[in-house]
Amino acid sequence: MTARLALLASLLLLLQLVPPSSAVVLELHGNVYPIGHFFITMNIGDPAKSYFLDIDTGSTLTWLQCDAPCTNCNIVPHVLYKPTPKKLVTCADSLCTDLYTDLGKPKRCGSQKQCDYVIQYVDSSSMGVLVIDRFSLSASNGTNPTTIAFGCGYDQGKKNRNVPIPVDSILGLSRGKVTLLSQLKSQGVITKHVLGHCISSKGGGFLFFGDAQVPTSGVTWTPMNREHKYYSPGHGTLHFDSNSKAISAAPMAVIFDSGATYTYFAAQPYQATLSVVKSTLNSECKFLTEVTEKDRALTVCWKGKDKIVTIDEVKKCFRSLSLEFADGDKKATLEIPPEHYLIISQEGHVCLGILDGSKEHLSLAGTNLIGGITMLDQMVIYDSERSLLGWVNYQCDRIPRSESAITSRL
């Protein structure tokens, strides 16, 4: 009896010593094709209004299009966010300083002393002002943040702005001081600067903040570059087929970017990949012939004798790719099976979901982006606490419930 009481006392003491970690789990909507976005529904403002935010680990600032009024704005699903003067963040506010630190620019403020900004993206730009408002976000510890700073974008310098898009704007999830994740941690909503996403090939998936959902085993981990503002495992070597030699002339600088629908390789690894894929098709699957796709984003496609419905119909014609990251004597391999780089178009063609970054995005300058298509059916974890990037095969169409780390450990 005395021994049992002692054991119980020890367990209670352990619970007091282990800091409670909380988790936020959010359902994802969308798909790689044809929607081209994975997004969450976020309720913002008081009273709250719903917005679709594209999850983007390649962007720092979360922002909405704003009726301030809005110039050159895109056609989006919901009514534009309308700020009030009380919501504006001033130039003197530390949040404004943090924003410009994240952007890597000297702080410049307009005559009204509000925190103005301009963000340049690969294919567009956004001009706006920093605001604060309520985000209705529930966590496993019951905490609900009062205010979150985000961008109020009132001028979008983007082509084809008259074309409707399926999302209202961006949920910035990269490393930085004004990211949503950093603000949630500073408010005590989560205790660890950890996030992850799980994108399902069936569509949808989930996003989580905090470390409570991270599996205790089976994850392939590799160090992240501590100095990089993006989530980069450094340089990786590209292989075609499991037993082949490297097809990249040199290790490739890699960034994991959930905001990129497709995967983008620099010119040399892209041409090498295209060459070996075509060579395999010419020798083993001559019934597939190259064709021009109506969707201009899909630059390399093949058609069969009949309309192709699923990747399984042509999977035997393609080989797996892999990226190998070295950390001393340790190696971490990201397997890229055909279903993680191929797309079946609406025309019934099979298309390469790896694009030439040197042509599509001229500013990439040799960087290779691992986009959503290559992260399908895997839990991808960005652990800034330990500077580790991890991935593990996962059934992403099953959304876990939010629970505290203490519960998951016992």
Curated annotation (Swiss-Prot):
Keywords: Aspartyl protease, Hydrolase, Protease, Repeat, Signal. Its EC number is 3.4.23.-. SUPFAM superfamilies: Acid proteases. Residues 24-46 form a propeptide. Pfam families: TAXi_C, TAXi_N. The active site is at residues 56, 257. InterPro entries: Aspartic_peptidase_A1, Aspartic_peptidase_AS, PEPTIDASE_A1, Peptidase_aspartic_dom_sf, TAXi_C, TAXi_N. Residues 38-392 form the Peptidase A1 domain. GO terms for biological process: proteolysis. Residues 1-23 form the signal peptide. One of its GO terms (molecular function) is aspartic-type endopeptidase activity. The keyword Protease applies. The keyword Signal applies. PANTHER family: ASPARTIC PROTEINASE ASP1 (PTHR13683:SF331), ASPARTYL PROTEASES (PTHR13683). Belongs to the peptidase A1 family. This is Aspartic proteinase Asp1. It comes from Oryza sativa subsp. japonica. The gene is ASP1.
